[in-house]
UniProtKB/Swiss-Prot annotation:
This is Alkanesulfonate monooxygenase. The gene is ssuD. Its EC number is 1.14.14.5. GO terms for biological process: alkanesulfonate catabolic process. NCBIfam families: alk_sulf_monoox (TIGR03565), PRK00719.1 (NF001939). It catalyses: an alkanesulfonate + FMNH2 + O2 = an aldehyde + FMN + sulfite + H2O + 2 H(+). Keywords: Flavoprotein, FMN, Monooxygenase, Oxidoreductase. It comes from Bacillus subtilis (strain 168). It comes from the Bacteria. Belongs to the SsuD family. GO terms for molecular function: alkanesulfonate monooxygenase activity. PANTHER family: ALKANESULFONATE MONOOXYGENASE (PTHR42847), ALKANESULFONATE MONOOXYGENASE-RELATED (PTHR42847:SF4). Catalyzes the desulfonation of aliphatic sulfonates.
Amino acid sequence: MEILWFIPTHGDARYLGSESDGRTADHLYFKQVAQAADRLGYTGVLLPTGRSCEDPWLTASALAGETKDLKFLVAVRPGLMQPSLAARMTSTLDRISDGRLLINVVAGGDPYELAGDGLFISHDERYEATDEFLTVWRRLLQGETVSYEGKHIKVENSNLLFPPQQEPHPPIYFGGSSQAGIEAAAKHTDVYLTWGEPPEQVKEKIERVKKQAAKEGRSVRFGIRLHVIARETEQEAWEAAERLISHLDDDTIAKAQAALSRYDSSGQQRMAVLHQGDRTKLEISPNLWAGIGLVRGGAGTALVGDPQTIADRIAEYQALGIESFIFSGYPHLEEAYYFAELVFPLLPFENDRTRKLQNKRGEAVGNTYFVKEKNA
């Protein structure tokens, strides 16, 4: 089992849709979140990509030197990056981070943003380009000299002089809910990622991916992307969820949904169907809440509850075959602590850092003793 957190390079806040409660999203804050995740024992962090985010490669490069064990899940963008350049970037960051790089393959889902970036190909063509990109990229990182000509990519005698630290290359994470996305992922990914859908939908998707991977003579692992709101009691958790969207008005939700409706991403369309823009029907499965998706693209659902309930819901996803969990919460610094301190002890997730986390003492009582020592 691995658990990753999230670096909010697109901004952070205590409330969605509120300017007054926003938090300055700069390198100092990113460093605070990354170092907290490193100290608490998270496996790694996801860095988002797109025009609303700081560049993930530069951000990860800056944070690698500020952390010790934390891994960085960073996006390659087929169609926007050439595979030879991406291979050099991958190899360099993997070496300077001492083998702590993970690769997130993002084909893109917003035609308007992609047009602004100079990419004018259809949804299915993006996955064709992704397949070609990863074919070349993987071969380069494995030390081959590559000549390749496809529909979207052509290289001649391309090679990589400095290999990555991880062999044969940093692990690949890849999500795509359409048939074209699943076919590309099945050929290349190490970990197939799904958005936080209800368990029955996740089960169906896992079966589709397994069958497609088997056709390629491969097996893949599975991961899920979710938000989380963990509190000591169910009531506190649901109150926190309601507070998070308490500043959202109907006009803001309508504008956000209109913007998200232009996406041609099957995954985004599946997220939108879960809540249909209706803030009165947000618990779409036990303890799975779609409130964040009212105004946020991509990951739009959260696990909400007390520690044991959240651990039980995670176990349900594990039983389906999910091994990698990528979480986030608003604001990201505080929620990293809430989740780690409350839920980690209930999960089959342990490393040297989580063991230190559990070997904790509170403030000295009466300048005389620590509570843990008294109760020992």
